[in-house]
Amino acid sequence: MNLNKNLPTGTRDKLFREAQAAYKIEQQVNHYFEKRGFKRIETPVIEFEDVFSSEHQADAKLYRFFDEKGRLTVLRPDMTLPIGRVVSTTGVTLPLKLSYSGKIFRANEDFGGEQNEQTQAGIELVGYPSIKAEIECILSGIGVLNALEIPNFQIELGHAAIYRRVIHLLNLPETAEIDFRLLIQNKSLTGIQQFVANNPSTLDDFILALPRLFGPAKAILKQAKNLTTDKGILTALSEMETIVEAVSYTADISVDLGLVQDFHYYTGIIFRGYADLAADNFLSGGRYDHLLEQFTSFSSPAVGLALNLDSLTTLQNRAGIIKKQAPTILLIHYDLDALPQAEKLMQETPNSELSFFDTSTNAISFAQKWHIPTVVHVSNQGIQTIFQKEADL
């Protein structure tokens, strides 16, 4: 079967206006991070599988292949772990404020509608234990969305320690923990009621309420504090309150106390970004204070933010924000010995381009086909207009 005209599942081409919009968004995001003092970092698209083994060892979403020495390598499925590898192996001095953008690859199931190749940009604050690091990530995310003019977006907060604390106190075996995780993620009221009946604990009231503990931040956090006396959960709720108070002036902030991230390295505040025109979140991140332990003997506090730039491009398109490229208004046909004059004219004339045809007849035909209103001929004798489209009445 010849596949030379096909694309792998979950990949797609971007043409013209969409490709230009995606390029500009990546530029805007990187420029915004640079203005906030972040230093850019780049890592290879190809990594050894061991970099992701702790997070993805039972995950079939990796693109795996062997290198020339028979070692198992992968296309990176996220950017955070490679940056953790860099920080832990290069001896760079902490703390650090890092930014990045690039491609990630995840082998999602066929027909799921997910893109296996995504463009991601983000930031990592490594070595900052203060809650100000979470606040900086959230403010940076909000700032990017405002700069991109994304309409009606909302930031949702959760806390990884809440779910971790519940699991710790329940002391569930691994299979039961997986089932419970799915119940929480799916907000299954009847399933959680049955679970509590089979696994009674001092957290019964809190667990039963978890599927409903999402919505306006201040009201939900106040309600949650009345449902438990556990110090670990109350500490997590207090951290969320602190962040809500700090950033609520910038955007609509909601909470979801049943928010469980797919990546298990999160240890504290987690957050996502949604918008009315988007089917899924396009912004995610949180605190992961033990990430470096996978690569070295020491740990370091860290907080990260990731943005799906492909989703943001789609959002801009749906919102009518993406502008058409300015049309070419002048085609410059030239003789080879007059190239310097033609180049100078193009540099001085906005929305102009050079003709690559040998004859003026072909240049004029091209202009008519692509609705370019004016064609000039540049020679050593000067500049002559050889085609002028009649003005529309």
Swiss-Prot record:
Pathway: Amino-acid biosynthesis; L-histidine biosynthesis; L-histidine from 5-phospho-alpha-D-ribose 1-diphosphate: step 1/9. InterPro entries: aa-tRNA-synth_II/BPL/LPL, HisRS-like_core, HisRS/HisZ, HisZ. GO terms for biological process: histidyl-tRNA aminoacylation; L-histidine biosynthetic process. It holds the Pfam family tRNA-synt_His. SUPFAM superfamilies: Class II aaRS and biotin synthetases. The keyword Cytoplasm applies. The keyword Iron-sulfur does not apply. It comes from the Bacteria. Keywords: Amino-acid biosynthesis, Cytoplasm, Histidine biosynthesis. One of its GO terms (molecular function) is histidine-tRNA ligase activity. Its main location: cytoplasm. One of its GO terms (cellular component) is cytoplasm. It is found in: Cytoplasm. Heteromultimer composed of HisG and HisZ subunits. Required for the first step of histidine biosynthesis. May allow the feedback regulation of ATP phosphoribosyltransferase activity by histidine. Belongs to the class-II aminoacyl-tRNA synthetase family. HisZ subfamily. This function is generally fulfilled by the C-terminal part of HisG, which is missing in some bacteria such as this one. This is ATP phosphoribosyltransferase regulatory subunit. It comes from Listeria welshimeri serovar 6b (strain ATCC 35897 / DSM 20650 / CCUG 15529 / CIP 8149 / NCTC 11857 / SLCC 5334 / V8). The lineage of its organism: Bacteria, Bacillati, Bacillota, Bacilli, Bacillales.
